[in-house]
């Protein structure tokens, strides 16, 4: 399974909404500008996310999108499944050697476990350890 730009950009939309959760609606235009992405492409991606209940649209001059649930209730797996379909890195064939079949199943389950245990809250609050500021004492 290779995650396409649909999945990558969909995660970007959702992470940006999670970062601004509780602050009101966020426009796709601002997400597109912040991440240097095509607003038109993001509009195509937000429709299935809205239909799945992962985001809600707010109309009006100050409208935009908000998360459909709390950031800790939405997983990366939820988003990827909506945009990419079932999570299956390799098609498991019944007539394949048992050892290889077991390997493919273990790989599939490991990928699912990572995606299903990573919440939007985790992704939105992630900080790279190297970005920590130095503390100078006098």
Curated annotation (Swiss-Prot):
Keywords: DNA-binding, Repressor, Transcription, Transcription regulation. GO terms for molecular function: core promoter sequence-specific DNA binding; DNA-binding transcription factor activity; identical protein binding; protein homodimerization activity. Residues 2-125 form the HTH rrf2-type domain. Residues 28-51 bind DNA. One of its GO terms (cellular component) is protein-DNA complex. InterPro entries: TR_Rrf2-type_CS, Tscrpt_reg_Rrf2, WH-like_DNA-bd_sf, WH_DNA-bd_sf. Disruption phenotype: Grows slowly with cystine as sole sulfur source. GO terms for biological process: protein heterooligomerization; regulation of DNA-templated transcription. Homodimer. Forms homotetramers at higher concentrations of protein. Forms CymR(2):CysK(2) or CymR(4):CysK(4) complexes in the absence of O-acetylserine. Master repressor of cysteine metabolism in B.subtilis. Controls the expression of genes involved either in cysteine synthesis from sulfide (cysK), sulfonates (ssu), or methionine (mccAB) or in cystine uptake (tcyP). Activity of CymR is positively regulated by CysK in response to cysteine availability. When cysteine is present, the pool of O-acetylserine (OAS) is low, which leads to the formation of a CymR-CysK complex and transcriptional repression of the CymR regulon occurs. This is HTH-type transcriptional regulator CymR. The lineage of its organism: Bacteria, Bacillati, Bacillota, Bacilli, Bacillales.
């Amino acid at each position: 399974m290779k995650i396409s730009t649909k999945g990558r950009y969909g995660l970007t939309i959702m992470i940006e909404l999670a970062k601004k959760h509780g602050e009101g609606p966020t426009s796709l235009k601002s997400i597109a500008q912040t991440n240097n992405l095509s607003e038109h492409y993001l509009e195509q991606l937000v429709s299935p996310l809205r239909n799945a209940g992962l985001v809600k649209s707010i109309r009006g001059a100050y409208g935009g999108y908000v998360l459909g649930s709390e950031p800790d209730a939405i997983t990366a797996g939820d988003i990827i499944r909506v945009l990419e379909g079932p999570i299956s890195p390799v098609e498991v064939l019944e007539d394949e050697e048992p050892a290889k079949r077991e390997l493919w199943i273990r790989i599939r389950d490991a990928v699912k476990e990572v995606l299903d245990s990573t919440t939007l809250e985790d992704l939105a609050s992630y900080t790279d350890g190297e970005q920590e500021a130095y503390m100078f004492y006098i």
